[in-house]
């Protein structure tokens, strides 16, 4: 849930430990993320944003910050009959300014136990809310292979094509068939390896900030 009060932000940080990651609720994707390392920094962050809003307090998402983590996703599907499948894993760890630049499927260098854990968590999430259709579960995986849940995207994302390449299925068609009341197609074993590289418009003269081109 979004958090508004400074006391709640501090309590969370004391419970889970610094550093923590702050993000305003009105920032899409990875935009607006700030890493906070201690109580003094949290108070400065909070007061600066409060002042900029003229006393109209923002709401924030706060999470434990995982240093040097990998951003790993599962492309999942579930039909109205309760059948579930993971079409592929994806690694989206290559980013700039918290925006994805390279997507890779299947996610490399993951041991079977971590893959099984990701699939178990994803299945549980979809079953819990009786999710029907295709979606993406996103996780952070630490260097010690500890898994943290990030979010569910209840849609196909632009990087779904790398999953299509390795599972051999048309995922847009899958989504339509499931919405029409059909059964999902169980995902076959991954074949080969696939990359998607995003072309972005950035200005090298200003530290690669986004540019209109």
Where do the PLM segments sit?
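A conserved helix-loop-beta module that forms one wall/lid of the active-site cleft
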Residues: 1-32
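ATP-dependent carboxylate activation and anion-phosphoryl transfer catalytic cores
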Residues: 19, 24, 29, 37-213
């Amino acid at each position: 849930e979004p958090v508004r009060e400074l006391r709640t932000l501090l309590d969370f940080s004391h419970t889970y430990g610094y550093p923590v990651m702050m993000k305003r609720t009105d920032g899409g994707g990875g935009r607006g993320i700030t890493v906070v390392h201690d109580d003094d920094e949290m108070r400065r962050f909070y007061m600066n944003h409060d002042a900029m809003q003229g006393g109209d307090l923002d709401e924030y998402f706060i999470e434990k910050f995982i240093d040097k983590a990998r951003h790993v996703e599962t492309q999942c599907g579930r039909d109205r009959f309760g059948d579930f499948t993971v079409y592929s894993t994806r690694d989206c760890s290559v980013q700039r300014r918290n925006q994805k630049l390279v997507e890779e499927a299947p996610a490399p260098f993951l041991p079977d136990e971590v893959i099984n854990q990701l699939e178990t968590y994803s299945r549980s999430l979809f079953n819990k809310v009786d999710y029907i259709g295709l979606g993406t579960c996103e996780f952070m995986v630490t260097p010690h292979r500890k898994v943290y849940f990030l979010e569910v995207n209840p849609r196909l994302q632009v990087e779904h094509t790398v999953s299509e390449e390795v599972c051999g299925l048309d995922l847009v068609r899958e989504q339509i068939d499931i919405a029409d009341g059909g059964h999902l197609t169980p995902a076959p074993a991954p074949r080969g390896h696939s990359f998607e590289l995003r072309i972005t418009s950035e200005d090298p003269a200003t530290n690669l900030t986004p540019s209109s081109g």
